[in-house]
Design a protein with these regions (language model features):
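Conserved beta-strand scaffold positions in the cores of enzyme catalytic domains, especially
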Residues: 13-16, 74, 99-103, 172
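Structural alpha-beta junctions
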Residues: 70, 95-101, 161-171
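Active-site-facing substrate-recognition patch
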Residues: 1-70, 105-136, 178
Length: 180
């Protein structure tokens, strides 16, 4: 199971579970290429990605379960696209955890993986509706479609910490790790 520790832009450390890294993306290159506008939905890589989507979602869910962590809360990163949804749904089908994804929203289009967006831009683009239970979260899993800069995850954690999150282990699950 590919798993690594990563530092976020704010210096916070997370555990990252992923299917493939930059050197071995294969059809998961679709996730990077579609955001940058460099690929057509009818291209062979897009067709291959969609053909393998359910298999890849199941594999990522297997990796998450095999971490041995009993996640009590799960959040899907807010996005203008729905690429993380199949992975999130497959993982939620395997876990007994509270889903707080609907508490997050993205108010404006910000490409968090791009060098043109600052960490503050990403924090400002994401909103969070606190419910007062954040202080009791112990093992948080964040699901996204890819991990590049870590700005989205750092922004989500900023809002959760502001709402009372503390003493909580953070794991991020993505199909594609877009940096080495």
């Amino acid at each position: 199971m590919p798993c690594t520790n990563q530092a976020l832009p704010n210096g916070e450390g997370i555990d990252l579970v992923f299917l493939r890294d930059w050197k071995n993306l294969g059809d998961l290159l679709y996730l990077q290429s579609i955001r940058s506008g460099r690929i057509d939905e009818n291209s062979s890589i897009a067709v291959s990605y969609r053909a393998m989507l359910s298999v890849n979602a199941q594999r990522l869910a297997d990796f998450v379960v095999h971490t041995g962590v009993e996640f009590d809360v799960v959040a899907m990163a807010p996005s203008s696209r729905d690429d993380a949804v199949p992975y999130h749904e497959c993982i939620m089908n395997r876990l007994c955890a509270t889903d707080i994804s609907e508490r997050f929203s993205k108010s404006k289009s910000t490409q968090s993986g791009s060098s043109g967006s600052s960490q503050q831009d990403v924090v400002d683009a994401i909103t969070y509706m606190a419910e007062g239970d954040e202080g009791v979260f112990r093992n948080l899993l964040i699901v996204d479609d890819s991990f590049a800069s870590g700005k989205t995850i750092a922004a989500m954690l900023y809002h959760l910490r502001k709402a009372g999150l503390n003493n909580c282990s953070i794991t991020v699950a993505v199909p594609a790790l877009l940096r080495q």
